Structure formats: C-alpha cells, structure tokens
Amino acid sequence: MAFFKEFREFAMKGNVVDMAVGVIIGAAFGKIVSSLVADVIMPPLGLLIGGIDFKQFSLVLREAHGDIPAVILNYGAFIQTVFDFAIVAFAIFCAIKLINKMRRQEEEQPKAPPAPSAEETLLTEIRDLLKNQQK
C-alpha cells in the first residue's frame, strides 16, 4: 500500500502534472503545425517553383516485381517534415524567449523593503518619545 501512496504523491506533484499538460498541448500543437505546413505553406511554395507538390518527390530504388513491392525513398515527405520541425522549433524559441523576458522583468522590479520587525518598531517609538520629551 505504501508503494501506491508514494506513486500518488509523485504523480500529483506540480512538476509532473505541468509536464503532462505540456506534452498533451505539445502533441496538439504539432498537429496544428503539420497542417499549417502541409495545407498552407507547401502548396504556395510548390506553386512558386512551378506547381510542384513536395509530397510527391520520391526516388524509386527498386521497381516492384510480382508480389515484391517497390522500394521507394520518399524524400518529399522528409522535406515537409523538416519544415514542420523548423516551424515548431521557431515557435518554441519565441515562446521561451518571451518567458525569459517576462522573468527578467519580474526580477528587475525593485522589491518592497521588508516591514520593520517588532523590535525596530519599539525602538522607533522610544526614539520618538525621547524626541518629544526634549522639546
């Protein structure tokens, strides 16, 4: 029973939960970026360079013979995946840069001086009383 209690405490720690949320959001973000590259960026890019569909780029290493399928190197899909990676890496870079900038701004803000301790307050009152007596 102690094993499950220890596992539950581990799983409920803030860092583990935050990481799980990040992984789930990252997976969804990856799908969005893949669609952006495949459906928005690559078609106009292919059109600009002569109506080329990058997904169709391939090199046949061995033709199909009977029941043996062809061996094909689909480097067009690889090019598209490289674009996916570049966009994801750029988006993560921008997000981390923004987060670091916000952290630096928080650190640069001057912190309010700590409230005087009870001893300091008492000494201040004594000082003020002594000043008033001297007048």
From Swiss-Prot:
How does this chain assemble? Homopentamer.
The entry's function note states: Channel that opens in response to stretch forces in the membrane lipid bilayer. May participate in the regulation of osmotic pressure changes within the cell.
By sequence similarity, the record places it as follows: Belongs to the MscL family.
* Keywords annotated in UniProt: Cell inner membrane, Cell membrane, Ion channel, Ion transport, Membrane, Transmembrane, Transmembrane helix, Transport
Q: Name one GO cellular component term.
A: plasma membrane
Q: Give the subcellular location.
A: Cell inner membrane
The cross-references to SUPFAM superfamilies, in alphabetical order and at most eight, read: Gated mechanosensitive channel
| Annotated transmembrane regions | 10-30, 76-96
Principal localisation: membrane
Q: Sorted alphabetically, which PROSITE patterns does this protein's record hold?
A: MSCL
Checking HAMAP family in the record gives:
MscL (MF_00115)
According to the UniProt entry, its GO molecular function terms are: mechanosensitive monoatomic ion channel activity
Name of the protein this chain belongs to: Large-conductance mechanosensitive channel
Organism of origin: Proteus mirabilis (strain HI4320)
Membrane topology annotation:
Multi-pass membrane protein
> Which Pfam family, just one, is annotated for this protein?
MscL
Question: Which InterPro entries does the entry mention?
Answer: Mechanosensitive_channel_CS (IPR019823), MS_channel (IPR001185), MSC/AndL (IPR037673), MscL_channel (IPR036019)
